[in-house]
Amino acid sequence: MNGPGLGQMSLFPPEPAPEPLLCWLWLAHTLGAGSGHAGQVLDAFGGAQEAWEARESDAFRAAAGIPAAQRARLPGNTPEHYRAFARRCAARGIRILPYDDPDYPLAFSRIPDMPLVLYCTGDPRWLNEPATIGMVGSRKPTEYGQQAAAD
């Protein structure tokens, strides 16, 4: 029988790429709020999906500033873990704006370590208007603050 040997073919289809929004949520959670490494990761990889694909590399770990103690958690933390969270946000009328979204505020993109995702209600185009009002949350909330935000 002619054809490729078993070493040349895969018995399983290639794993599909995760949805871009889920990759942004994964990257934002992996780096953590206020990590100071968002700009380095985007400079090195271009976007969240590319960072996901490079997650096992030393280059990703260096750009992300992930200490050795935290490296073990990366393989189990996949973009798919954020699907239910994204659905809950959508059900509550909360829009998730990743860094590459056209409605992401231009002023935020100029911050050296910008938030990788923003959560908003209403029309996000107002965020690019000269006079805006925003609600700012803590990068290190108290337990009470976390519970209040969840409710």
Which residues make up each language-model segment?
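Short, positively charged patches
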Residues: 2-151
